[in-house]
Amino acid sequence: MSTDRYNARDAEPRWQAIWNERGIFRTRNDDPRPKFFVMEMFPYPSGRIHIGHGRNYVMGDVLARYKRMQGFNVLHPMGWDSFGLPAENAAIERGIHPKSWTYENIASMKEQLQLLGLSLDWNREVATCDPSYYAEQQRLFLDLFENDLAYRKESEVNWDPVDNTVLANEQVIDGRGWRSGAVVERRKLNQWFFRITAFAQELLDAIDTLDRWPDKVRLMQRNWIGRSEGLEVLFELSKGSVAAAGTSAVKVYTTRPDTLFGASFLALSPDHPLTQHLAATRPDLAAFVADCKTGGTSAEAIETQEKKGFDTGLTVVHPLDAARTVPVYVANFVLMDYGTGAIFGCPAHDQRDLDFARKYGLTVTPVVLPPGADPAVFAVGSEAYDGEGTLYNSQFLDGLSIADAKEQVARRLERFRVGEQPQGTRKVNFRLRDWGISRQRYWGCPIPIIHCDSCGPVAVPREQLPVELPDDVTFDRPGNPLDRAKAWRDVPCPKCGAPARRETDTMDTFVDSSWYFLRYASDNPDKPLDKDAVRHWLPVDQYIGGIEHAILHLLYSRFFTRALKACGRVDVAEPFAGLFTQGMIVHETYKDKDGRWLFPEEVKLLGDGKAEKLDDGSPVTVGPPEKMSKSKKNVVPPEVVVDTYGVDAGRWFMLSDTPPERDSEWTQSGIEGAWRFVQRVWRQVQEAIELGAPKGADKPASFDAAATALRRAAHGLAHQVADDVERLRFNVAVAHVHEFANAFGQAIASARTASPVPADLAFALREAAEIVTRVVGPMVPHLAEECWAALGYDTLLAEAAWPKAEPELLVENTITLPIQINGKKRDDITVPRDATAAEVEAAVLEMESVRRALDGKAPKRIIVVPQRIVNVVA
């Protein structure tokens, strides 16, 4: 039997071609086997992938192949998140149309992904920029529109005054447009929204059911939804302020009514109606409000900017102490779309309020005393106190806990009246805001609405869908090209026939990815959203992707299924039963003497953190491992790995050593070690074929110790790796295969010294080769197919069953017990698992180490704890 090296260059493309020709990964919806739906977050087609992109796809592939071997009908699809701003940037910078750029990238990246040997059903491939995909998305939009879950309202956006365009929050850098560098303005535009807040409580409650999601992700979603229970409090304007304010009271939402006696100011949003009323006649306030409009619109941008305030000169009466008044400010950190757009500031117990109070010389009155603190000396310095304690400086609340004080304030203010209203009203608020989906860009899904001066927003008739993007647009000037596409834009109103205009905003690309898993479920292109297919396949059994999508994408997807369920389009509420967030592949960075980044293939590593350029031997600075990035050139193309080591070596390395949820460093020594192990498995299988029993040999009636040990190792491997893969512990599965290879190697070496090889050992060798081939199949599928063929099978390993471990071989016949003498461990003893206490005691007393410790004396007592420990009392 030949033990030549495994030739990956020959085997890998050959087996991939066979899989494709036979269509073995094509999934049928009418397959009677139990379903298993595994998918990885689909990629944006940016151009080329590197090996770091492959880790999550390989993990998903291992699970898909394993489940297929377990007898499941596996759906493992792939697609392209192909709308988005980078394509428009390419159009501007390179003069290439977004469609051409995108489809060229899809073709290139698909070719690269296919190198990885992934068991994907390419028949269900989707591209979100394809009209066949976004036609259904437009129908879904109309479903939401007709059910009042999609609506239009005026909202603030980030406006670049130089490029004359709206910027996403991530495009605002330090308050300036990322391309023009201009100071960004906040401008109000009519925008489309999805009413995600209608499902806020349901989305929050259902997090508790997601027991196969990482705790960190669940916590992030809870915090993003941000449910709070508080009190809406009416602060009456002082008599001298009512006329100027044009109103009698300001409504404030607070989660800390217990701290009301510590209030030293009221702060209004720049967009609050009272602010706008005052600014209409006060140029100084109007200028302040205009200044507040610069910078980003995100909550993060507002939170991190310098805190500024404007004293309106108005005062309000303290709701619990009519003798006190509180000044009213306008502050740039108060958001109009949270609570009521007005807050009261208690500087002693909120850091933001404290910073504001110190800046404007406002009083700081602590009202919560920390446990054990002396009220006579406790004071707030540079840090606010936000911990537990008892109330003081608070009149009737003194001595109460925070919880009791909140309740007392709520009850009292609920009884007080301001006009016809209670002064206090209990209120639940959510941090979650409705999802603004409007984007003033070309390369996105058109919103199927027509605007008519007489009829308002009118839905495009469904028979006219899809509203396709026009191809004849230009990117030679700032702004949205759709605004300039008159032939496309100007249409008659579907209701009255009068001249009208198409909506020129396109949808946020997060909409595209919020339902693509539903599209995968259908194998019928004429029914892209098939309710029966969705009922069959959903929820996704295992979703794999980066934790950077923990909030927006995953939360929007959870909303989308609920919204579509409310519209009668699907039956499922939760889209993903299991979620796994993988770590990244990281790599060292390299710079030449001039500070230019270098690709790894341009560098020769010398050891001890030193390196030089391959072409001229000049020194190279080696940086710490970082996320693979094209800009820093610390990327490894999959082609390099495939050409040099084979894709299976790359797959093995990606699965090895590091827990899959952590970052893994790509190293030359690591990939070389993986290649050597692939060769070792190949060699061991070949040797087992040479020395072992022929295919289909009868099982011997009995096995000696050596054969039994090998069989235990092989059956244990099948059992252990199955558990590892089910629990997504791929690195542990790899470790178990390494451990087995050592036992397999010892058995092969033993067989080589025997002449002839005993029949029981020959059978065990053959059985072990077949088991290890099937066990590594999901991880190194090309190698496994080659081994399977060498073992004499004309079927495909990819369609083989997972090996069933014999239960009796999973239980060891012997057990090792520690021996303690006077409480100190002295040795271990291995005895039959069913040995009696008397037999164990006798064996212990025969041990030389025990005799030496007893020094010829008889022990006072020997205590045998069955299958646990032996205690000797001397």
UniProtKB/Swiss-Prot annotation:
Matching NCBIfam families: leuS_bact
Catalytic activity: tRNA(Leu) + L-leucine + ATP = L-leucyl-tRNA(Leu) + AMP + diphosphate
Cellular localisation: Cytoplasm
Protein family (similarity comment): Belongs to the class-I aminoacyl-tRNA synthetase family.
HAMAP family in alphabetical order: Leu_tRNA_synth_B
The UniProt record lists the keyword Protein biosynthesis: yes
Motif 'HIGH' region positions after renumbering to this chain: 43-53
Residues the entry annotates as binding ATP: K630
Keyword set includes Iron: no
Enzyme type, top EC level: ligase
Principal cellular location given in the protein's record: cytoplasm
Region (Disordered): 614-634
A Pfam family annotated for this UniProt entry: tRNA-synt_1g
SUPFAM superfamilies: Anticodon-binding domain of a subclass of class I aminoacyl-tRNA synthetases (SSF47323), Nucleotidylyl transferase (SSF52374), ValRS/IleRS/LeuRS editing domain (SSF50677)
Chain positions of motif 'KMSKS' region: 627-631
EC number(s) on file: 6.1.1.4
Keywords, in A-Z order: Aminoacyl-tRNA synthetase, ATP-binding, Cytoplasm, Ligase, Nucleotide-binding, Protein biosynthesis
Protein name (Swiss-Prot/TrEMBL): Leucine--tRNA ligase
